Amino acid sequence: MSDPHPDLRQPLERLNENEQLKARSRHLRGTISEGLDDLLTGAVPGEDPLLMKFHGIYQQDDRDRRADRRQRRLEPAYQFMVRLRIPGGVLDKHQWLGLDCLSRLYAERGLRITTRGTLQLHGVRKPHLRPLIQGLLPLGLDTIAACGDDSRGVVCGANPYLSQAHERLQKLAQITSDRLIPKTGAYADIWYRQPTPVRDDEEPVYGELYLPRKFKVGFVLPPVNDVDIYGQDLGYIAVVDNGDLIGFNVCVGGGMGQLDNREDSYPRLAEEIGFIDADEAPAFAELVMGIQRDFGDRRDRHRARFKYTLDRLGLPWFLEELERRRGRPLEPARGIHFEHNGDRLGWQQGDDGLWHATLYVESGRVDDALRTQLGGFLQQYGGRLRLTTNQNLQLTHIEEHELEQVRWRLEDLGLDWRLTPDAQAAHTLSCVALPTCGLAMAEAERYLPELLERFQRLKGQYGLREKPITLRLTGCPNGCARPYLAEIALTGRAPGLYNLYLGGSFHGDRLAQLYAGNVDEERFLALLAPMLERYAGQRRDGEHFGDFLLRKQLLEERPLTSLSS
């Protein structure tokens, strides 16, 4: 077996540049404050943009304007994306209305619901970063650890107000998130201008190097796999007995990101390893994250995710190390069953009699019209909202006596169609991609409406228009919209060209396979047409498209389209 300490035993200078940056950053302070105060440039210079990710902020520029600004000898049109930390996606209406106001003041590209059930504010200029983050404070919100080499925002599946089990699931997700947040004083120092001394013991869990890469934690309650639990570094699958949440099946090692030009880079499904009691979940997460902190690869950043640590050292080694730290082995996993990984749109009633409405939001984009509509509704009804990991929005806590009036009000505001959208649209995700994401190689969100229209037209030719198929579109292979768990996925390779993946599960528990590389829209539709035709005529009752492709062995013969770069 390889040395279980391949990196932390090495001198710092032998680790990758990001590790060295963290070590000299004074627990994520760097020179961010000085960069914010320099108004001669719209950017934060040097290494600080990497550190700002730990603060929930990405430095970007408008790629549509690069050539023009270069020709005019101007610096890029710098702007920032600010991501909030909202464990489980739960907000009250005052927080939402406050965010609406802040986004109108500071976010030129508006609000977007992410595939981890939080919000991003796009198009924030550098002088507006501090006022924005200071404006979040009285709302009880922040952005710390929404990005960076730490535990990203903890996701939690399903509406927490449907039952006591759902509510407890949300509370445990919140406790876990709070436990895994970095403790550095850098956030208050930089953003609230509250000077804090740098201490050696500032990060008792993370240490000065934090994690090798991001670490994603998710909670889910079957039969709905709405967070795609098998794509998480650490996943908790709720086990409910007579309405009580008694514990979790634990799964480890999931992850979506990959590089197309490296064979040792790949998506991976998380593996179920056993069962724990419900109350242990927060402490257990710290244990697992600690193993990744100590043994993750800190030399090759592209191999630093937890999935690669497990594959490098082996699952038996991990279970042995986990047992040593925990003091006892895991119990056997309990039986669970998933039915789908989408949201249940429309109306649902909780055990307490209250009603909740889930609204479809295209690619999670909360445009000006939707913000105005939601503002009008929340000023009259509702107390809380919830953001889903499928980029939708739930209006919760509607009393029975209000229900009819609320239905009328949603219709008056033009929101009622979002309760019953097109079935295919409701099962489709995309990432932001161009023009702001620096990693995007092709369009995604802006292209999705056109692609979806043509795909629906093709399905309609075979009588499948109302049959949902999970479809995901991303601008690069990094997997932000969890493409490798979809029945059909396109990941960007170059402008207008994508890799086509097929055969994932409708339940989110099987990886899709690379079927064709560098396909354009016409080739994509041409490849799918005969498969959809056979699916229409030969599928079994209730059989999903991905399952059909595997049963009929339609993915065994790859087309001639190049799979190489």
Where are these regions (language model features)?
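Peripheral terminal and linker regions in Fe-S/redox and tRNA-modifying enzymes
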Residues: 1-565
